[in-house]
Amino acid sequence: MSDAVAAPAPAESGRTPPILEVRGASKLFGPVRALDNVSISLDEGQVLGLLGDNGAGKSTLIKAITGVHRLDAGRIYIDGHPADIRSPNDARALGIEAVYQDLALFDNLGVVSNLYLGNELTKPRWLRALGWLDRKAMETEARRKLDSLQVHLPSFSSSVGLMSGGQRQAVAVARAVAFATRVLILDEPTAALGVRETRNVLDTIAELPRRYNVSIVLISHNMDHVVEVCDKAVVMRQGGVVGEVVPTAETMEEMVSLIVGARTHKEE
């Protein structure tokens, strides 16, 4: 059993604690301060846009949340409980899944193996790791999950390394969507997708909080996508948070200004 969750943190009176909260996160890579006292919160059923130019600290932050990096200072809370996330397995035990820009796929494996790596179905189910791989069940479920995203692949038997960038992206998104039970983190999920696949991913992002009660952190440079699906947006620059905005067509210019450093909330 994972020991990722410790004792509950004090919650504000009468307020349900955020499903995910980061307080005072700092991270150094040698002399480079990748994160500088970053605090964000994600409420249950919410879609949070995490915005910023390249090098703003977004990827470092989400890799700290998912156990890839360890914070030098600050804490991560899940449902108000301090979470000691030491590895991606700890994050998964807490229901957190992520799709990174590098996709983290195994090019020499097929679609089904990539979708279920570390979450293999076995028979009998109660034996778990001691059972036999239920390849038929995994393929059936993989087809159902990809069909729900309207992703059509030329062959399930082909290795992922032979697929197009858009097909690989779709497999990575489908894997994360399939196993996220609390928080889904998506780092530029539509970057390599065509128009139809992009539409399907955006529809899935909008649907997940309502249908499955999964909260989402979306990293995107596409302001139109942020306005369409996000409930709030946090803007990062040079490792710190410089503003929080409710994304609408009217606030799009404000978000861009925060990203490029033309203004900060402190100036208002």
What are these language model-derived features?
Residues 2-268:
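Glycine-rich phosphate-binding loops of nucleotide-dependent enzymes
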